[in-house]
Amino acid sequence: MKEIRIHARAGQGAITTARILAMAAFEQGRYALAFPHFGAERMGAPMNAFVRLDDSKVQLRSRVHAPDYILVVDPSLAASSDFGVFDGLKPDGLAIINYAGDVDTLAGMTKAKIVTVPASEIALEILGQDRANVPLLGAFAAATGEVKIEALEKAIVQNFGEVKVATKNVEAVRRAYEMVAGQALTAKR
């Protein structure tokens, strides 16, 4: 089983991200479970969503404490140890972060590999608003191979429904996928 933890602020689309990722895995014949965790948070408060992917039925329904992968929608969460973004991330795990800067500035935060993608910039350019969550899914597909880009695209169309919205989101996910597919995955220690 592969476990994924998504870090974002309320209103940044973490729940949508988890749902689309689970839909894409299901499209490929895998089992998936996606769910959020938040309390009485208001818009902008840190929150998490979780996804479990497996080739057999997913029974475990607790929060993910030792993820194989983390996705960070809001880079300010990764920049502070207060939010525990890297807590429990497996040493051979992977952090995919919405970040336009140099990955070396994040290297001391975890022993796991880090991949960055300027998801906010991609979203602003293509969608006209900072919806970094969907481009991060493209980065996830390219960096991990856990879901195929075609399955993600289909899940996006199913999730958003409206052709114009879905088409732009597919373009954003594809752009991030292509950017990350060109990066070498080297451990930053």
What are these regions (language model features)?
Residues 1-189:
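Active-site cofactor/cluster-binding pocket
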